[in-house]
Amino acid sequence: MESPLQVPDRRSISVVTPVYNGEASIVELCRRLSEVLPQIATQYEIILVNDGSQDRSWEVISELSSHSATVRGLNLMRNYGQHNALLCGIRAAKYELVLTIDDDLQHPPEEIPQLLARLDEGFDVVYGAPKTEQNGLMRALASHITRLALRAAVGSDVAKNVSAFRVFRTQLREAFANYQSPFVSIDVLLTWATTRFGATTVVFQPRHSGSSNYTFTKLVRHGRIFSSTPVSSHAACKLGHCFR
C-alpha cells in the first residue's frame, strides 16, 4: 500500500523559496521539506534566495548549505522584491519541476503531493489555493491586484486561486528567458508559456513568526508589474554569490 504522501510518477523537483528576514523559520522549513521530498521525488534541491535580509538569514542559509547537498543558497546584494528573487531561483533551477513556497511556513510542505497530483491531470501550472486567507492587509491587496491583472489572461476561475504556493514545469521558463524588467510577476510570465492552469485547495497556516514584509511602497511597486523599464532582473541574480 502506498504512503499517503506518494503521488504517481516520482520526478525531480527544484523548490525555490525567496527569503527575507526568515532566520526564525527557514531551518524548520528545510527540515519539513527534507521529510516530504524524498517520498515524492527521485531528485530534489531546495534553493533559498536571500533577498537582502536584514537579519541572519544568509548566515543560516550558508550553514544549511554547508551541511546538506540538497540545499543551495543565492545571496542578492539588496532587497529586489519577492518576485525578482523568485525569478533568480527559477533561472537557477536544474530539475524538471519548480515548486515555489514562502519562507514563513504558511504553505505547509506536507501539502506538496496534492499540487503534484493535480499537475498529473494535465496542467502545466498548479496553485495551492487557501481555504482561508491568512494574509495581512497589504499582502491581501497585493494578491487582489495580481488576480485582477491575471483575470483577462487566464480567466476568473484560475485568477481567483493564484497564490505563491505553486508548481510548474521548468521548461515554461523558456518563454520568459529574455525577460528584463525590474517589475516582475511570476504569474504573468507563466501566462506567456501556457494556458493550462489548475488549482487545488490546501490549508494555509498562520505565519511562523513576525509579520508580513509587505509595505505600502512594495504594494505600489507590485501594482506596476506591467512596466517595461529596461533594467535586467536577470542581472540581479549575478549581484551577490551563491553556494553550489
Each language-model region and where it sits:
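Structured catalytic core of nucleotide-sugar glycosyltransferases
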Residues: 1-137, 149
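Acceptor/aglycone-binding surface of glycosyltransferases and processive sugar-polymer synthases
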Residues: 72-78, 82-92, 97, 106-188, ...
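Hydrophobic helical membrane-anchoring modules
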Residues: 1-9, 185-244
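Residues at alpha-helix boundaries and short interhelical turns
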Residues: 20-23, 68, 180, 194, ...
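Non-catalytic alpha-helical coupling and interface elements of nucleotide-dependent molecular machines
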Residues: 38, 66, 150-154, 195, ...
